[in-house]
């Protein structure tokens, strides 16, 4: 545990903090911020504004994205479901940008939505400046506690679990192969998925969640020196949750 500068283990329904270390310390978030993009897409589907079958069109701006991508050309159409696969499994910056522009009208406007949603969730020490985590690494920040609050909200979206726990997939009739870096998603019992990764100038993070029976735990492990340490600590923290805690209802007194 000494290797991670910041982590939180939280029960997803009550937001009870089970374990933490420097949970309120500001850290660079790297590609963690894609999870807010995914959440806003899921909530747009909840409102009926979009569906997994909705076709979105790639812009010149999306095409200009560097880093991980699914090679979208300007004017190319792709369903929201496939774009989400690109983001969740492949960490694709161009797919993330297409989703952001569809929901917000522009990436700048979408970033405003990211920050307002963070405030609604009680993420009071978090700032988003763009939608991918690739370009705004020095300016964007969060805390392990704030990150865990986002994970609690994401854990409600069962329609995303299959994508979050997929190891591999493909797009464009096999032209684009997607391979997740999140090894826990398809290995940890009860996993509801999420993400691990880094950014150009941030440490490694592991954002994980799992549900067994009627209890769900999420953990945000931030600012680690390497991916293996982040993943091992996330697994250890989830084990602590499932091995040591359960949800009970207080007894109802007899009249």
Q: Which stretches of residues belong to each language-model region?
A:
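Penicillin-recognizing serine hydrolase domain
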Residues: 2-6, 105-255
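Active-site-adjacent loops and short helices of periplasmic peptidoglycan-processing enzymes
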Residues: 1-145, 154-155
């Amino acid at each position: 545990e000494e290797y991670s500068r910041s982590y939180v283990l939280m029960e997803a329904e009550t937001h009870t903090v089970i374990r933490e270390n420097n949970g309120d310390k500001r850290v660079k978030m790297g590609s963690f911020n894609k999870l807010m993009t995914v959440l806003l897409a899921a909530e747009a589907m909840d409102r009926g504004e979009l569906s997994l079958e909705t076709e979105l069109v790639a812009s010149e701006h999306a095409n200009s994205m560097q880093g991980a991508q699914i090679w979208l050309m300007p004017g190319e159409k792709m369903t929201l479901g496939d774009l989400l696969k690109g983001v969740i499994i492949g960490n694709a910056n161009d797919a993330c940008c297409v989703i952001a522009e569809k929901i917000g009208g522009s990436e700048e406007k979408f970033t405003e939505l990211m920050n307002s949603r963070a405030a609604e969730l009680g993420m009071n020490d978090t700032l988003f400046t763009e939608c991918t985590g690739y370009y705004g690494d020095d300016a964007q920040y969060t805390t392990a506690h704030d990150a865990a609050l986002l994970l609690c909200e994401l854990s409600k979206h069962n329609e995303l679990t299959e994508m979050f726990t997929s190891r591999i997939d493909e797009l464009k009739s096999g032209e684009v192969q997607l391979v997740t870096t999140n090894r826990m998603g398809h290995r940890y019992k009860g996993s509801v998925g999420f993400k691990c990764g880094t950014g150009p100038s941030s440490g490694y993070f592991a954002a994980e969640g799992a549900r067994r029976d009627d209890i769900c735990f999420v953990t945000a492990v931030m600012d680690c020196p390497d991916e293996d340490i982040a993943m091992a600590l996330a697994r250890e923290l989830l084990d602590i949750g499932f091995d040591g805690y359960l949800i009970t209802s207080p007894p109802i007194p007899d009249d």
